Amino acid sequence: MWKLGRGRVLLDEPPEEEDGLRGGPPPAAAAAAQAQVQGASFRGWKEVTSLFNKDDEQHLLERCKSPKSKGTNLRLKEELKAEKKSGFWDNLVLKQNIQSKKPDEIEGWEPPKLALEDISADPEDTVGGHPSWSGWEDDAKGSTKYTSLASSANSSRWSLRAAGRLVSIRRQSKGHLTDSPEEAE
């Protein structure tokens, strides 16, 4: 069994094997063991140094510097802040602040085509082939394909309507199991 101690490699032989060879380890094995020891210390140092970054180093060395270098130190800190990559939360906020393109402005995007069953289902609700919902206004471009909620007063009504629609979709998906909506609940 190999043991490490004070910069050299020692070989411990069990008592029953002491009768055979009394010499040290073979030279190839000793060289391999020394390489392992050197690699282990280097890996250990890398682990310790990976815990700290350059900002920490500047902060720790700041106390040792003379008062003359305070101005340059501030400039270095400002440069580091400018060079720093933005963090996760900064990226998240930037992505939310960027206005996304409207679907009709995306290259290669086409509006969904309604099936004939959907168009013929509610003929009294359609005006010019598009459903007319009160409380919804046209976009700034005047497009009748895309609409947005006009007033916040109607938002609760629309949220209730959307919840009701979700329930009906859920019931339809369970339709193959039950015949009536009362049995589904």
Curated annotation (Swiss-Prot):
<dbReference type="GO" id="GO:0007283">
    <property type="term" value="P:spermatogenesis"/>
</dbReference>
<dbReference type="InterPro" id="IPR031399">
    <property type="entry name" value="TDRP"/>
</dbReference>
<feature type="region of interest" description="Disordered">
    <location>
        <begin position="121"/>
        <end position="156"/>
    </location>
</feature>
<comment type="function">
    <text>Contributes to normal sperm motility, but not essential for male fertility.</text>
</comment>
<dbReference type="GO" id="GO:0005634">
    <property type="term" value="C:nucleus"/>
</dbReference>
<feature type="region of interest" description="Disordered">
    <location>
        <begin position="1"/>
        <end position="29"/>
    </location>
</feature>
<keyword id="KW-0539">Nucleus</keyword>
<dbReference type="GO" id="GO:0005829">
    <property type="term" value="C:cytosol"/>
</dbReference>
<comment type="subunit">
    <text>Interacts with PRM2.</text>
</comment>
<protein>
    <recommendedName>
        <fullName>Testis development-related protein</fullName>
    </recommendedName>
</protein>
<dbReference type="GO" id="GO:0043231">
    <property type="term" value="C:intracellular membrane-bounded organelle"/>
</dbReference>
<comment type="similarity">
    <text>Belongs to the TDRP family.</text>
</comment>
<dbReference type="Pfam" id="PF15683">
    <property type="entry name" value="TDRP"/>
</dbReference>
<keyword id="KW-0963">Cytoplasm</keyword>
<dbReference type="GO" id="GO:0005739">
    <property type="term" value="C:mitochondrion"/>
</dbReference>
<dbReference type="GO" id="GO:0005737">
    <property type="term" value="C:cytoplasm"/>
</dbReference>
